[in-house]
Amino acid sequence: MSKRHRLDLGEDYPSGKKRAGTDGKDRDRDRDREDRSKDRDRERDRGDREREREKEKEKELRASTNAMLISAGLPPLKASHSAHSTHSAHSTHSTHSAHSTHAGHAGHTSLPQCINPFTNLPHTPRYYDILKKRLQLPVWEYKDRFTDILVRHQSFVLVGETGSGKTTQIPQWCVEYMRSLPGPKRGVACTQPRRVAAMSVAQRVADEMDVMLGQEVGYSIRFEDCSSAKTILKYMTDGMLLREAMNDPLLERYGVIILDEAHERTLATDILMGVLKEVVRQRSDLKVIVMSATLDAGKFQIYFDNCPLLTIPGRTHPVEIFYTPEPERDYLEAAIRTVIQIHMCEEEEGDLLLFLTGQEEIDEACKRIKREVDDLGPEVGDIKIIPLYSTLPPQQQQRIFEPPPPKKQNGAIGRKVVVSTNIAETSLTIDGVVFVIDPGFAKQKVYNPRIRVESLLVTAISKASAQQRAGRAGRTRPGKCFRLYTEKAYKTEMQDNTYPEILRSNLGSVVLQLKKLGIDDLVHFDFMDPPAPETLMRALELLNYLAALNDDGDLTELGSMMAEFPLDPQLAKMVIASCDYNCSNEVLSITAMLSVPQCFVRPTEAKKAADEAKMRFAHIDGDHLTLLNVYHAFKQNHESVQWCYDNFINYRSLMSADNVRQQLSRIMDRFNLPRRSTDFTSRDYYINIRKALVTGYFMQVAHLERTGHYLTVKDNQVVQLHPSTVLDHKPEWVLYNEFVLTTKNYIRTCTDIKPEWLVKIAPQYYDMSNFPQCEAKRQLDRIIAKLQSKEYSQY
C-alpha cells in the first residue's frame, strides 16, 4: 500500500523521480550501516571468544610450567599483564610485551616469563624447552636427597651412570646451594679429565642456565681460559685446578669442588684428591664431591674417611654383544668393514659409534668410510661421518650432537657415524647411538723409570672400559655392540680396571707442582695408590739435574718459576734458560710448536707431495729448527689458510701454536724475562738456539756408535732416528724430544748438537765418575781433558 502510494506521489509531482532516487540511496546507506554494525558485533564476539581461549591456554600453560618449575625447585610464574592493561603496566613490562609480540608472530602462545637471576632478564623460550628435557634426566629424582647430603656432609661420593645427567645438573644445584648461603658468594669448580668434555659441557650448561658462555658459566683448559670475573661455575681440566692451587693453596675462591670422572684415575685427579683431602681439614666451609661413572666407589669412600655414597641409576636399555670368532689381524680394517656392513644391512634406524686410538687413525678411518660409502652408489642411505678427539676446535666437537641425514625416498636409512677416541666412553653422551664398534684398544701412557722412557702405547682396554663402551649403545633404546676381539680374550686377557695413571707416568711435573704447593714430604703424601719409589726418585733426580730442586730436595727460585709454566719441566727450563743465549723469541716459537698436535699433514693419497713440501722447510741441523722455519713462514704469509693447504700444513695446529706462544710470552713478562733474539746474520743465531735446547734436554741425547746404530747416553738403549725426521745424515750426537716405542725404538724430533755443549751446560749430569762404559764415555772423557787443558777456550 505504502509502496503504491509513494509511486502515485511520484507520478503526481514532477520532482518525484529525483526524490525516489534519494530515498533509495538512504535505504542502501542504512542497510550498509546495519551490516557493518552486525559485522563489528560478530568480530567483537569472535575476539572475545579467542581471548577467552588464549586466557585458558595461557592458564593451562602457566599451570604446566609452574608444575615443571616447582618440581625443579624454581619459583612459580606470576600471571602476565593483558594486552589491554594500563599504560604504566605496559611500560613496566615493555621487554616482555615486545617478546610476546614476537612470539605471537611466530605462531606461539605467549609464555609468562620469570626473571633469570643471573642476567635479570626474562628467561628465553629456549630455556623452558631445555628445562623440559632436563627434568626427564634420571638425576632429577634425586635432587632432594643430593641437597640433603650436600648440606649435612663436607665430602661425599656420587656414582651415576653415563647419561644420568650428573655432569650437567649437579654443578648447577651446587650453584643454587652456594647462592642460598649468607656472606660472600664463592664459586663452583667441576673438573674433567679431558679438555673436550670441559668445553662441550660448559657450553651445554651455559645454555641450560640461559647465560653466555664465558660469563656466569666458563671453562679453563691448558692454554685457553674462557671465563670472567662474573663466572660462578667453571668447568676445567683437573690439571688446571691443580695449577690454580699453586697460587691459591686453599682454593678460597671455590665453595664446592666436584671431581668428575674420578674413575678414570688420571694423574692430576689422583693428586687433586690428595690435595683436597688436606684442604678440607683446613676449610670447614669447603664441599668436595667425587663423581664416578662406575660402581667401584668403595675405594673413594674409604679414602675420604668413609664418606657417604649417593647412587643414581642410569636409564639404560639391553645391549646385545657380538664377538669375533677369531682375533682380527688388522683392527682398523675390520672396524671400517663393520661400519659399512651395519650401514647397509641393519634394518633399524640408529647411529654408529666407533672407538679408535688417536687422531691419525680417526682421520684415516673417516676418509675411508666416506670413500667406500660413496662408491656404493645412490641406492644406499646417506652417511654423516664425524671425528671426535681432544684437539678438535669446540665448534667441530659440537657436530656430534647434530641429527643424522634423513631417509631417502627408497627407504634407505641415513646414519651418523661418530669416530672417537675413548673420550666418548664416559665423558660425553651422544644420543641416538644404537650400534657401537669396539676394537678393544686405546692409547695409554706407559713409563719405564729404569730407562726413563715415557711413551703413548696402543694397549688393550680393561673390562671396565669395554663395559662402558657397550653401554653407549643402550642409551635411547636397545642396541648392539660389536667387539672386534674374541670372548676368550675379554674373559681371560683383559684387566678388570684401567691401571691408575700415577702408576705408569713420569712424575717430574707432578713432583714440581707438589713442591710448589709446599708439600715437601712426598713419601708420606696421601696418594690413593702410591707410585713406585723408583719413579719418585727418578722425578726428584730429573728436577735436581735441571736445578729446579737443590741437593736437599727443596724448590729453588728457578724451580718455582718453572712451576708457573704449563709445560714439562724440560721445556720450562729451556724457555727460561734461552734468555741467557739471546734466543728466547725463537725458543718460545719452538716450544709452542712442540706443545700442539703435529703440524705436518701427510694424506695417504698425496704422501710424496707432502714429503716434498716438508723438505722445503727442512733445516740441516734437524727437526726443532725445521719447526721454527714453519712458524716463521706461517707468520710471514699472514697466517693464510690457503698457504697452509698448499704446503700440507695443519692450519689449526699453527693457530694453536700462536695462541700458546702468546700465553707463554705473558708468563715470561710476568717474571721480567727478556724476550730477545740473536741477529739473524750472526753465525751464532742457530748455535745459540741449539745450546738453549741442550739446557732442557741434555738428559735426552743419543750417540752414533761405530756399528751404525744410536745408543742413548747413560741408559744405553739401542734406538733409531724416526722416519719422520728431516735429518738427511746421521749426526754423531743428537738431542731428541721423545722416545717412541713401536716395533722398534725410535727417537723423534731430533737436532744435531756438539758434545762440548753437554759437558759445559750440564757438568753435574755429565760427571764421568758415574757414567757407564761406552764409546760416548770415552769420547766425552777426551773432550773434558781437552777443555781442562785449556785447548778449547771457546765452545
Swiss-Prot record:
Extent of Low complexity compositional bias: 79-108
Compartment(s) of residence: Nucleus; Nucleus, Nucleolus
Modified residues (N6-acetyllysine): 488
Domain Helicase ATP-binding: 147-313
Impact when changing residue 523 to E: Abolished interaction with NKRF
MF terms in GO: ATP binding; ATP hydrolysis activity; ATP-dependent activity, acting on RNA; double-stranded RNA binding; helicase activity; RNA binding; RNA helicase activity
Outcome of swapping residue 536 to E: Abolished interaction with NKRF
Family annotation (CDD domains): DEXHc_DHX15, SF2_C_RHA
Outcome, altering residue 540 to E: Abolished interaction with NKRF
Region (Disordered): 1-108
PROSITE patterns (alphabetical): DEAH_ATP_HELICASE, HELICASE_ATP_BIND_1, HELICASE_CTER
Effect of residue 429 to A: Abolished ATPase activity
Expression sites (tissue/organ): Ubiquitous.
Enzyme category, top tier: hydrolase
Record GO cellular component, one term: nuclear speck
Annotated ATP binding sites: 160-167
Activity regulation note: ATPase activity is enhanced upon binding to G-patch domain-containing proteins. G-patch domain-containing proteins act like a brace that tethers mobile sections of DHX15 together, stabilizing a functional conformation with high RNA affinity, thereby promoting the ATPase activity.
Subunit structure: Component of the U11/U12 snRNPs that are part of the U12-type spliceosome. Identified in the Intron Large spliceosome complex (IL, also named intron lariat spliceosome), a post-mRNA release spliceosomal complex containing the excised intron, U2, U5 and U6 snRNPs, and splicing factors; the association may be transient. The IL complex exists in two distinct conformations, one with the DHX15 (ILS2) and one without (ILS1). Interacts with TFIP11 (via G-patch domain); indicative for a recruitment to the IL complex. Interacts with SSB/La.
General function of this protein: RNA helicase involved in mRNA processing and antiviral innate immunity. Pre-mRNA processing factor involved in disassembly of spliceosomes after the release of mature mRNA. In cooperation with TFIP11 seem to be involved in the transition of the U2, U5 and U6 snRNP-containing IL complex to the snRNP-free IS complex leading to efficient debranching and turnover of excised introns. Plays a key role in antiviral innate immunity by promoting both MAVS-dependent signaling and NLRP6 inflammasome.
Family: Belongs to the DEAD box helicase family. DEAH subfamily. DDX15/PRP43 sub-subfamily.
Name this polypeptide is given: ATP-dependent RNA helicase DHX15
Organism: Homo sapiens
